[in-house]
């Protein structure tokens, strides 16, 4: 009986020792407005919900409104450096391009206000790009709940990122 207890203790100890958690950090840089849209926060919330549901430790840097692509690199580099200091495994750069020129309600959380969302997944330690992509949202008229449509779109992006991380 004593041998069984020791064997069980050894197996549990090995399992705990081998267990490790994956951590992901991200930052959303928004183009198209000088103020952060609430849509960016809905996307952020969708990413948090998705990764938390998968058991992944998730953190973010605050969303930033950028006036041009030339500033994006410095924003992302600062956030990636903070992620490295925090011991994060992966960093995701998200760029949300908004265009509300044809929108019926430019201030609302609508998919039609989002032109595209691009992402790049980096290994924080090596700086290597593991994958990237860009998605254009579907027609928002197919969603009865406009906010849910934006959240579902964020879940789709998060799923693509998750597949890159799990390769």
State the predicted function of each range:
Residues 31-33, 99, 140:
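A short, flexible beta-alpha/helix-coil linker loop
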Residues 24, 92-96, 119:
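Generic structural motif
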Residues 1-7:
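Bacterial N-terminal signal peptides that target proteins for export
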Residues 7-16:
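Bacterial N-terminal signal peptides
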Residues 11, 84, 109-111:
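Generic marker of residues within folded, mature protein domains
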Residues 26-93, 128, 132:
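N-terminal segment of the mature soluble domain
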């Amino acid at each position: 009986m004593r041998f069984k207890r020791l064997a069980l203790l050894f197996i549990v100890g090995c399992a705990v020792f081998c267990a490790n958690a994956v951590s992901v950090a991200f930052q959303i840089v928004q183009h198209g407005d000088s103020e952060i849209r609430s849509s960016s926060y809905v996307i952020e919330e969708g990413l948090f919900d998705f990764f938390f549901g998968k058991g992944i430790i998730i953190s973010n840097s605050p969303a930033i409104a950028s006036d041009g692509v030339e500033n994006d690199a410095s924003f992302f580099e600062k956030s990636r450096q903070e992620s490295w200091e925090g011991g994060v495994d992966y960093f995701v750069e998200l760029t949300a391009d908004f265009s509300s020129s044809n929108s019926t309600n430019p201030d609302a959380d609508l998919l039609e206000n989002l032109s595209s969302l691009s992402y790049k997944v980096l290994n924080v330690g090596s700086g290597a790009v593991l994958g990237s992509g860009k998605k254009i949202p579907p027609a928002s008229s197919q969603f009865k709940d406009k906010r849910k449509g934006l959240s579902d779109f964020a879940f789709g992006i998060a799923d693509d990122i998750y597949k890159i991380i799990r390769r």
